[in-house]
Amino acid sequence: MSSILSEYSETNGNMVELIICNNDGMAEGAVSALQGAGYNTGDGKTIPVFGVDATDSAKQLINEGKMTGTIKQDAEGMASTIVNLVSSVKNGGNLMDNTSSFNVDEGVAKIRVPYATYTGE
């Protein structure tokens, strides 16, 4: 991240505008690198950083104004969905049998499990 910040900087006229990470650990690393470059210290000079998992440490960074947001995935909802799919196959059915109560994308084997955003208390 530090090398990216030196290549894409205000001085070079091509600044990083947004950082989206696959998890909060990566987002926290990005925040740390940004802080080393004078951004996201809580003083308003901020590059938005988003993560996934809604960890306590990420929520704290968000509440301090150092990180922008995170997504909390529904682990129980995902587990329940998987159990339903496994049960269908175990009982001799099709993988997507008994999914009428789920949010299923038509034409593909994909089920959407709701999530929640967190952008501060």
What does each model-identified segment do?
Residues 1-59:
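Hydrophobic alpha-helical
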Residues 24, 73-76, 80:
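Electropositive phosphate-/nucleotide-binding environments in soluble metabolic enzymes
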Residues 64-76:
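Short beta-strand elements at the ligand-binding edges of bilobed clamshell
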Residues 77-121:
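Hinge/cleft segment of the Venus flytrap/periplasmic-binding protein
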Residues 33-36, 64-65, 85:
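Short, glycine/charged-enriched secondary-structure capping and boundary segments
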Residues 53, 74, 121:
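Residues at the C-termini of beta-strands that transition into short coil/loop
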